[in-house]
A protein has these predicted regions:
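Hydrophobic, often amphipathic alpha-helical segments used for membrane interaction and targeting
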Residues: 1-90, 108
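C-terminal soluble interaction/assembly domains
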Residues: 71, 75-126
């Protein structure tokens, strides 16, 4: 009987992608295709970090992947999702799931939520 909603919509994600020049999208996709094996191994590492709850390593990986687009891909979205989280949390209790790369760091959602006065604690799975 719980209501589900998002802290980021598909339209938000599309707007984020539209801020990135087409040439950059093409360059990223070309690199992924040329480096498929390496990227597959890297994703396995990232899944292990996720399973261990190592958000610092996941944040470092997301930050490295975003390179010059950190502001667009991470920081602006962190602010948007944190603001939406706050709006919902004022009205009702909630469970919020976001990509692990958005949690850690000086501009991460955990720090933004703590700054806004929320108590933040990890939930152990399994």
């Amino acid at each position: 009987g719980k209501t589900t909603t998002g802290v980021e919509t598909f339209a938000d994600q599309l707007a984020t992608l539209r801020k990135i020049p087409f040439e950059q999208h093409l360059k990223s996709l070309t690199w992924l295709l040329k480096n498929y094996g390496r990227q597959k191994r890297r994703l396995k590492k990232m899944m292990n970090w996720y399973a261990k709850g190592d958000i610092q390593q996941l944040y470092k990986a997301a930050k490295k992947d975003a390179k010059g687009m950190r502001r667009i891909l991470l920081y602006e979205r962190n602010i948007l999702m944190t603001n939406r989280f706050e709006e919902i949390a004022r009205e009702q209790s909630l469970f919020c799931a976001v990509g692990a790369g958005h949690l850690a760091g000086g501009k991460g959602m955990l720090r933004l939520l703590k700054k806004a006065g929320f108590k933040v604690k990890p939930v152990q799975l399994g």
